[in-house]
């Protein structure tokens, strides 16, 4: 509900007070953002990438005449913070896509050249191509995941 309220609010025009380039306070008007979307990333109750969760989120979007399309985050709570489980999330989403569902407009994944992550204790000992934040899939797993998704989209078409 909070995400849907945020999408609805962002679509509307808003006014705000801010300094201009010369430092004078000015009232600005936005035109609104027609591209707001939900990102399912899991939460305190666990993952929410499964077909039931995706369909429920899209039903809520439909109740407010919003496009029934969303983004699925393969990482964070959807993989229980175990980066290799992103491939399991990808397999599930691929099955949803192959079944003809059109709800998933995009995905997010934690990916880098080298798998895993590293602490930033000593910047001189950092390994090139490896994350210093969240653990990531490596290049090979990323290409496998993207190929799986491409094949799923082709199978749906």
Q: Could you tell me what each predicted segment is?
A:
Residues 118-136:
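Acidic, Ser/Thr-rich peripheral helices and adjacent loops at domain boundaries
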Residues 148:
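Nucleotide/phosphate-binding sheet-loop regions of phosphoryl- and nucleotidyl-transfer enzymes
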Residues 72, 138:
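Conserved, mostly hydrophobic/aromatic
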Residues 151-157:
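Generic C-terminal helix-cap and adjacent flexible tail
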Residues 1-49, 53, 76-77, 81, ...:
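Active-site-facing alpha/beta catalytic cores
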Residues 36-37, 68-70:
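Conserved active-site beta-strand-loop modules that form the wall/rim of enzyme catalytic pockets
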Residues 59-63:
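Catalytic-site microenvironment of enzymes
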């Amino acid at each position: 509900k909070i995400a849907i309220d945020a999408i609805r609010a962002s679509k509307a025009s808003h006014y705000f007070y801010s300094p201009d380039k010369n430092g004078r306070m000015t009232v600005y008007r936005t035109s609104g953002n027609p591209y707001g979307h939900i990102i399912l990333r899991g939460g305190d109750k666990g993952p929410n990438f499964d077909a039931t969760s995706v369909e429920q989120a899209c039903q809520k979007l439909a109740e407010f005449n919003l496009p029934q399309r969303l983004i699925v985050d393969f990482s964070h709570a959807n993989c229980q913070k175990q980066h290799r489980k992103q491939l399991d999330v990808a397999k599930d989403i691929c099955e949803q896509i192959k079944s003809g569902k059109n709800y998933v407009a995009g995905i997010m994944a934690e990916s880098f050249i080298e798998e895993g992550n590293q602490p930033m204790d000593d910047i001189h000992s950092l390994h090139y191509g490896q994350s210093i934040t969240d653990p990531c899939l490596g290049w090979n797993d990323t290409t496998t995941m993207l190929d799986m998704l491409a094949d799923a989209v082709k199978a749906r078409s």
